[in-house]
């Protein structure tokens, strides 16, 4: 499976998360995953909440349309974006 896959109702992203970064950004490919740096620390779900908010902003969707399918407690996550309104250039570059 590639880092970004299209589904009937949106996209599935395989992510590698770097918490406590200096700024939020989609960095690019990291092996077979997309690396995303976020400023939130990995404490009490703060990183997951921040990731959902950041991805919702990047794809111009509601936070409820960003679903963490796998990896709730780890750095490796699978996230589904339902009906994205915009595709960030870093994601479009690796979309299959």
UniProtKB/Swiss-Prot annotation:
CC per GO annotation: cytoplasm
Highest taxon in the source lineage: Bacteria
Listed Pfam families: DUF167 (PF02594)
Alphabetical list of NCBIfam families matching this protein: DUF167 family protein, PRK05090.1
Family affiliation: Belongs to the UPF0235 family.
Full protein name: UPF0235 protein ESA_00387
